[in-house]
Amino acid sequence: MSYGCQVSDDEPNGSKAVSLLLRLSTLALALTSAVVMATASECTVVQLNGVVATITYKDFPPFVYLVGFNIAAAMLEAAAIYLRLSTGGGDDDDEGFKGKLPGILLVVIDVAVQALVYTATGGAFAAVSAYGPQINACGAGAGRFCGQVHQSKLLSFAGSAAVGLAVVFRDVSLPFSLWPTSSD
C-alpha cells in the first residue's frame, strides 16, 4: 500500500505542459503586439517646411509587417495548440503516416511561426533605429505613438523568445508531470 506520492510507469509530461504554456504565451504576446501597434495613436507634427503631417504606424512599412506577421503567427500558433492538444503532437508510431501527419504539421507550423515572429521583431527594431527621429517626434506631449511603438516592439521580442523556447521544450524531456496521466 502506498501513501502520499503516486508512482507511475507513464512518462513525465512536464515538457508538454511547459511547451503548451510557452505556446499560449507566444499567441498572447504576438497578438498583443499587433494590437498595440495597430492602435498606436496618431501623432500630428509640424515639419521643418511648416507642413502639418499626421503620422501613424502605416507610414512605416516594417510596422505594417509587424502587425500582419504577428497576426498570422498568432493564428498559426492557435492551430499548433489545437494540434498539440487534440492529437498529442502526432507521437503515435502505430498509425503510419496518418498518425505522424499532425507531428509533421506541428513542425512546419513551428518553423513558420518562428520565421514570422523573428522577421516582424527584427523589422521593428530596424525601423526604430532607421526612423528614430520621426518616431521620437511623436514623443512626450504629441501622443502615445512613440510609447506604443516601443511597447509593441518589446512584446514582439518576448513572443520571439517564447516561440523559440516552446520549440526547445517540445523536444526536451523534463522529469516531472504537471497534470494527471491517463489511468488506463
Swiss-Prot record:
Disulfide-linked positions = none
Q: How does it sit in the membrane?
A: Multi-pass membrane protein
Is the keyword DNA repair in the record?
A: no
InterPro entries assigned? CASP/CASPL, CASP_dom, CASPL
What is the protein's major site of localization? membrane
Segments in the Cytoplasmic topological domain: 1-16, 84-100, 175-184
Subcellular location per the Swiss-Prot or TrEMBL entry: Cell membrane
Keywords annotated in UniProt: Cell membrane, Membrane, Transmembrane, Transmembrane helix
Q: Which GO terms describe its cellular component?
A: plasma membrane
Q: Does the keyword Hydrolase apply?
A: no
Pfam families, from UniProt? CASP_dom
The residue ranges for the Extracellular side of the membrane come to 38-62, 122-153
Bilayer-crossing regions = 17-37, 63-83, 101-121, 154-174
Subunit and interaction comment: Homodimer and heterodimers.
Task: Describe the family membership recorded for this protein in Swiss-Prot or TrEMBL.
Answer: Belongs to the Casparian strip membrane proteins (CASP) family.
UniProt protein name: CASP-like protein 1U2
Give the lineage.
Answer: Eukaryota, Viridiplantae, Streptophyta, Embryophyta, Tracheophyta
